[in-house]
From Swiss-Prot:
Lineage: Eukaryota, Viridiplantae, Streptophyta, Embryophyta, Tracheophyta
EC category name: hydrolase
InterPro entries from the UniProt entry: DEAD/DEAH_box_helicase_dom (IPR011545), DEAD_box_RNA_helicases (IPR050547), Helicase_ATP-bd (IPR014001), Helicase_C-like (IPR001650), P-loop_NTPase (IPR027417)
Gene assigned in the entry: RH58
CDD domains for this protein: DEADc, SF2_C_DEAD
Chain residues that bind ATP: A120, Q121, T122, G123, S124, G125, K126, T127
Protein name (record): DEAD-box ATP-dependent RNA helicase 58, chloroplastic
Coiled coil: none
The Helicase C-terminal domain, residue ranges: 314-472
Domain remark from Swiss-Prot or TrEMBL: The Q motif is unique to and characteristic of the DEAD box family of RNA helicases and controls ATP binding and hydrolysis.
Organism: Arabidopsis thaliana
Length: 472
């Protein structure tokens, strides 16, 4: 196989020691040594980290430090020598001190220049992982686009841009700042064209359509970018109408041999087949590394899953009863997309009908907001702005809110319509339980008909969770 998971079988003589704990004992200079880089950049035929080469730098390992009680490695220790000091300082100011599992496993590999597929559950820190890689490679003195992050939706793009700008914020240290541009659907492309030509940003966060438009108009080029990230890669390849444009970005507008490519997602169906396609289609280099951090449970343990069986005609009243009994602090109510047949018949979408019902029947204090793909971009942005200004909310949304949007105050997810796939269930549920340092149990409630019970059972089996029936 042309990819590898991060396996280190030769470490059997270190009892109960993981790959990460070995790296936790190394000094930052360890990663700069020629022999170490040779070990980490093992040839495609070896597919495994060459510990014989690593052993050449054994003097770098502190005496008696490889034990079961090794102090956890900090993000600074992992990134020292790669990421600029002012970025590390800002990272710690924001509150990123200790790495998540995906950061601990992926960053040492990313810093060697290898292409990576970051595969870990929602809320696991994939965004910060690839941003730290980008900041390790950016040269602020160079006036060109050096990193491109491709996202499926405007909302996720706004979120990634916000985190990137927080990290890149000017510090007291006398260094030139790193500029970040958001090139997202619905933006003012004329202004972006002028910006790209006059003073190209170092980092560009873009939706597929807007990015391809700029490239086709020759406003700028990405054949010289150092890093290309595709976030929510499974959605862009398997669930969107932009597959052709994504493939073109990866092969026609730039070459995988001239850049470092990073794919990220919580769900990559048939990941072995996907890795094979990455190599065969030349989306990545042949020695791409699939870093799969699989939690014991695919779902966050802080989530409690429930379901209520009801008739379709009674769903509005059942939802209202759940809102009154559960009294969520904030909630997202997921509604299915309107079918083409329903649109042609001139029917109102389910989101509109539900919004009208809630505004007349819900007596609680939460603000009722709407987010769906058919809204104009200004309305969508306004909804998210209202949410982030504080206060509780009831957000009625289609699956546009299921990917990447971070609303930490969300305590409840209501699946008014059951998601169509197990992947959609995973991403919807992952919008709750994201508040840092909170041990609060959050609720995922499903409103289903008796005919849909077997579908929910299949999701339970695949995602290894148990769903309790509620009687109203």
């Amino acid at each position: 196989m042309a990819s590898q998971l991060l396996n280190v079988p030769h470490l059997a003589f270190f009892p109960k020691i993981s790959y990460a704990s070995v790296f936790s004992t190394l000094k930052p200079s360890f990663f700069h040594s020629t022999s170490t880089r040779r070990a980490l950049k093992s040839s495609p035929s070896s597919r495994i980290i060459n510990l014989q080469a690593v052993a050449e730098t054994s003097s770098e390992i502190e005496s008696n430090s490889v034990t079961e009680t090794t102090v956890p490695l900090t993000l600074r220790q992992i990134c020292q020598g790669f990421v600029p000091e002012h970025i590390l300082h800002r990272m710690e100011e924001i509150g990123f001190v200790f790495p998540t599992d995906i950061q601990r496993e992926a960053l040492p590999t990313l810093f060697t220049g290898r292409d990576c597929i970051l595969h870990a559950q929602t809320g696991s820190g994939k965004t910060l992982t690839y941003l730290l890689l980008i900041f390790s490679l950016i040269n602020p003195q160079r006036s060109s686009v050096q990193a491109v992050i491709v996202v499926p939706t405007r909302e996720l793009g706004m979120q990634v841009t916000k985190v990137a700008r927080m990290l890149a914020a000017k510090s007291e240290i006398d260094v030139k700042g790193c500029t970040v541009m958001a090139l997202l659907d619905g933006g003012t492309l004329r202004r972006h064209k002028s910006w790209l030509k006059a003073e190209p940003p170092a980092i560009l966060v873009a939706t597929v359509a807007s990015l391809c438009h700029m490239l086709e108009k020759h406003i700028f080029r990405i054949d010289s970018v150092r890093v290309l990230v595709v976030d929510e890669v499974d959605f862009l390849f398997y669930s969107s109408k932009q597959v052709g444009s994504v493939r073109k970005l990866l092969t026609s507008f730039s070459s995988c041999d001239k850049r470092q490519t990073v794919f990220a997602s919580a769900s990559i169906p048939q990941h072995k087949h996907f890795v094979h396609d990455c190599i065969q289609q030349k989306w990545t280099k042949r020695d791409v590394v699939h870093v799969h951090v699989s939690a014991i449970m695919p779902m966050p343990l802080c989530l409690l899953h429930r379901f209520v069986m009801c008739e379709k005609t009674n769903k509005h009243q059942v939802l209202l009863a759940l809102l009154e009994s559960d009294a969520p602090e904030s909630a997202i109510i997921f509604v299915g997309e309107q079918s083409e047949k329903s649109k042609k018949a001139g029917n109102d979408p389910s989101t509109t009908l539900l919004m009208e019902f809630l505004k007349t029947s819900y007596k609680g204090s939460l603000e009722i907001l709407l987010l769906e793909g058919d809204m104009n971009f200004n309305s969508r942005a306004a909804s998210l702005t209202e949410i982030r200004q504080g206060g509780g909310f009831l957000l009625v949304s289609t699956d546009i809110a299921a990917r990447g949007i971070d609303l930490p105050e969300t305590t409840h997810i209501f699946n008014f319509d059951l998601p169509q796939t197990v992947t959609d269930y995973l991403h919807r549920a992952g919008r709750a339980g994201r508040k840092p340092f909170s041990d609060r149990k959050c609720i995922v409630a499903n409103l289903i008909t008796s005919e849909e019970r077997f579908v929910l059972q299949r999701y339970e089996n695949e995602l290894m969770f148990s769903c309790e029936e509620m009687m109203l």
